[in-house]
From Swiss-Prot:
Protein source organism: Caulobacter vibrioides (strain ATCC 19089 / CIP 103742 / CB 15)
Sorted UniProt keywords: ATP-binding, Cell inner membrane, Cell membrane, Membrane, Nucleotide-binding, Translocase, Transport
Protein name, UniProt field: Lipoprotein-releasing system ATP-binding protein LolD 1
Compartment(s) of residence: Cell inner membrane
Membrane topology summary: Peripheral membrane protein
EC number of this enzyme: 7.6.2.-
Xref: PROSITE patterns: ABC_TRANSPORTER_1 (PS00211), ABC_TRANSPORTER_2 (PS50893), LOLD (PS51244)
Family to which the UniProt record says this protein belongs: Belongs to the ABC transporter superfamily. Lipoprotein translocase (TC 3.A.1.125) family.
Function field: Part of the ABC transporter complex LolCDE involved in the translocation of mature outer membrane-directed lipoproteins, from the inner membrane to the periplasmic chaperone, LolA. Responsible for the formation of the LolA-lipoprotein complex in an ATP-dependent manner.
């Protein structure tokens, strides 16, 4: 199995004047292609910091990070931004859709060149993805007219637009009611199983973690548990 994530000795230290806070303390982590993993831990455990480093939003203080075999922790800011846009997909607790853009335009947005328009091929891809997430009847609806669950499904389609190596989901169900959350989780399961998409999901919800094939537990900046469950996400 190809490793999508390979992190070695990841540390992160934040400085505030003379004060030094060690948030991550030597994280070693691999995530294989096609895995669906949940990352859990109490507030302050380092989950969000590790997710930001893997998502190339923060640089580690020490350690190395490779994604799909490519070393990324030492890339320039310009190359990090390019890699992030082209090779990673993101789903957040709050969908961050453009309210006046249609569902199709929101999905296609990551593929559009800065200052450029949306090509016919991009529109076709976006429509196909919206159909994939069950929103073929909402393609031309402005995002502001969609329900919370529908908006999060648009966000998942958007994350898939550039065929990313890895989809990073930060509390993707945290702003949804239970029924909508279950539908979003079911959709992630389908995309993971049928398309082989690799997911890393950060969550406080034990119900979400229990349905994933792997559970990573962080405590006080360390990876304290790494459990695989082949029956997860049933």
């Amino acid at each position: 199995m190809t490793n999508v994530i390979e992190a070695r000795g990841i540390e992160k230290v934040f400085h505030n004047g003379d004060e030094e806070t060690r948030v991550l303390k030597g994280i070693d982590l691999t995530l294989g292609q096609g895995e669906l993993a949940a990352m859990v831990g109490a507030s302050g455990s380092g989950k969000s910091t590790l997710l930001s480093i893997i998502g190339l939003l923060l640089r580690p203080t020490a350690g190395t990070l490779s994604i799909s075999g490519e070393r990324v922790d030492d890339l320039s800011e310009r190359m990090r931004a390019r890699f992030r846009n082209q090779r990673l997909g993101f789903v957040f607790q709050f969908h961050h859709l453009l309210p006046d853009f249609t569902a199709m335009e929101n999905v296609a947005f990551p593929a559009a060149a800065p200052g450029g328009g949306i090509s016919r091929a991009m529109r076709t891809r976006a429509r196909d993805l919206l159909a994939r997430v069950g929103l073929e009847d909402r393609i031309d609806f402005p995002a502001a007219r969609l329900s919370g669950g529908q908006k999060q499904r648009v966000a998942i389609a958007r994350a898939l637009m550039n065929r990313p190596d890895l989809i990073i989901a930060d509390e993707p169900t945290g702003n949804l009611d239970r029924e909508s959350a279950d539908r979003v989780l079911d959709l992630m399961r389908e995309v993971n199983r049928e398309e082989g998409a690799t997911f890393l999901i950060c969550t406080h919800d034990d119900g979400v973690a229990a349905r994933c094939g792997r559970r990573l537990t962080l405590s006080d900046g360390r990876l304290t548990s790494n459990v695989r469950d082949p029956g997860g996400f049933s």
